[in-house]
UniProtKB/Swiss-Prot annotation:
Activity control, per UniProt: The formation of KHG is inhibited by halides and substrate analogs such as hydroxypyruvate, tartrate, oxalate or acetaldehyde. KHG aldolase activity is also inhibited by bromopyruvate, which specifically esterifies Glu-45. Activity is partially inhibited by p-mercuriphenylsulfonate, iodoacetate and N-ethylmaleimide.
pH dependence: Optimum pH is 8.6 for KHG aldolase activity. Optimum pH is 8.4 for KHG aldolase activity.
Record PANTHER family: 2-DEHYDRO-3-DEOXY-6-PHOSPHOGALACTONATE ALDOLASE-RELATED, 2-KETO-3-DEOXY-6-PHOSPHOGLUCONATE ALDOLASE
Protein name, per record: KHG/KDPG aldolase
Lineage: Bacteria, Pseudomonadati, Pseudomonadota, Gammaproteobacteria, Enterobacterales
Result for mutant: residue 184 to A: 1.35-fold decrease in catalytic efficiency with KDPG as substrate. Has only a modest effect on the catalytic efficiency with KDG or KHO as substrate
Site (Plays a major role in determining the stereoselectivity): 161
Record-stated family: Belongs to the KHG/KDPG aldolase family.
PROSITE patterns (UniProt xref): ALDOLASE_KDPG_KHG_1, ALDOLASE_KDPG_KHG_2
GO cellular component, one term: membrane
Residues of the active site: 45 (proton acceptor), 133 (schiff-base intermediate with substrate)
Entry's Gene Ontology BP terms: Entner-Doudoroff pathway through 6-phosphogluconate
Technological use: Is an attractive enzyme for development as a biocatalyst, however, as with most enzymatic catalysts, substrate selectivity ultimately limits the broad use of KDPG aldolase as a synthetic reagent. The enzyme has been the subject of directed evolution studies and structure-based approach to identify mutants with enhanced substrate specificity. Site-directed mutagenesis of the active site or the phosphate-binding pocket can expand substrate selectivity for unnatural substrates for use in biocatalysis applications.
Length: 213
């Protein structure tokens, strides 16, 4: 972690909403990122769920410098190295393994690993991490479960993801332990396919404004 160019905390506090993005066509990446930034959302999680995901990260990092682009669904050290080379400024994983944690502590970008149990949280803390993704948030008991897990660990902060929606994201943001939330509703697949970037900007702006209430 001593080689990290920035901290996980500084990235997550830039939130409060981090879009969880699936880019199916490379040509969508840059205009989508610009649309989100125009709506006030700068931290973008591009998931490694499609063949063009790494190239999308590379394009956004190069052409939309005002965005803080990271990689989601990072599963192993090889993927961590690949997204780092592509220009990702952070990495998010759905869970944690010791090889991935070791690679992250020796790497140059922050890893925000997913946890759903206290034991997983403590393993991550053993590697010096303090920021985690709580995933899948709603399926694991939602706000009440996160409150209970966070209780003994006052120094730890979270980005809950999974089942987060406009109807419940403010409930998570109200928790002291939560720095931001991750949500897929900001970049609907049909809006991307139609090239409706104004809709993406509108959704981003509504999410940012709603977080202030």
């Amino acid at each position: 972690m001593k080689n990290w160019k920035t901290s996980a905390e500084s990235i997550l506090t830039t939130g409060p909403v981090v879009p969880v993005i699936v880019v199916k066509k490379l040509e969508h990446a840059v205009p989508m990122a610009k649309a989100l930034v125009a709506g006030g959302v700068r931290v973008l999680e591009v998931t490694l769920r499609t063949e063009c995901a790494v190239d999308a990260i590379r394009a956004i990092a190069k052409e939309v410098p005002e965005a803080i682009v990271g990689a989601g669904t990072v599963l192993n050290p090889q993927q961590l190295a690949e997204v780092t080379e592509a220009g990702a400024q952070f990495a998010i994983s759905p869970g944690l393994t010791e090889p991935l944690l070791k690679a992250a502590t020796e790497g140059t970008i922050p890893l925000i690993p997913g946890i759903s149990t206290v034991s997983e949280l403590m393993l991550g803390m053993d590697y010096g991490l303090k920021e985690f993704k709580f995933f899948p948030a709603e399926a694991n008991g939602g706000v009440k479960a996160l409150q209970a897990i966070a209780g003994p660990f006052s120094q730890v902060r979270f980005c809950p993801t999974g089942g987060i929606s406009p109807a419940n994201y403010r409930d998570y943001l109200a928790l002291k332990s939560v720095l931001c939330i991750g949500g897929s509703w900001l970049v609907p697949a049909d809006a991307l396919e139609a090239g409706d970037y104004d809709r993406i900007t509108k959704l981003a702006r509504e999410a940012v404004e709603g977080a202030k209430l």
